[in-house]
């Protein structure tokens, strides 16, 4: 019966404690720009296709998996970006999952030739579901592990619309942005007589690109990028801080995630999550492949197995030297 206690706790938390619900997180957060901030939609010279995969807690089979695919386009003639994205997240082997399809739009306003601001909006349609056959309910335990539950009032599938927005200020070398997700606080409850409003997720991110070969930003092929990303949802918050080094077509990154000494989840459980190692390879400025591994440093370190993450990006070649596309915001892994 011990093997089934995890599903009991997971379902109990899902149904009765909505404040702890968290969105999927990506260590390579800039590798999924529309998910990070809709203002980053179309932050490329042309079209872009992005694929993301994350396996979290691989040491607790089958782990938690997140898949995402996105496409966006920069319409420089109207100072805009448009894109679409699909994300699927599965929690363990218990059939608890969510799938979201969304569309994003961004608009760019130039301050001068070297500075600009962008605003973005993302509208999504989400479906959350679970398979009750994979859970053990309290009434089954009471009835000597009965094969079926008498539990009533559960909804196996719930759907809702979701609204996110964000803003960005940027130059060729510096950027600072914010985003707010779930502005409409949709109800994600899986109980027919309950309510579980999804907490808003806020994000603040900034960074700086430093050329190391004497060339200007944008022309340099050897540069250091330093960045930080703070995110909060309900009672949960974390800070990612680190950087990555570009050496021609190869990149290496090192990050830390947590808020040690500043905040604890509970007495004896500090907000100390992971050290992230990252490596990537770029081919002729079109294909980019990035792999990262989260080394868990929290109390789960011995059993979690860390997290593996892979991102693949393809950017269509730049067709014209459009003056409106002189600067492109945000770094690229």
What are these language model-derived features?
Residues 8-16:
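Bacterial N-terminal signal peptides
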Residues 22-333:
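Subset of outer-membrane beta-barrel
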Residues 1-8:
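Bacterial N-terminal signal peptides that target proteins for export
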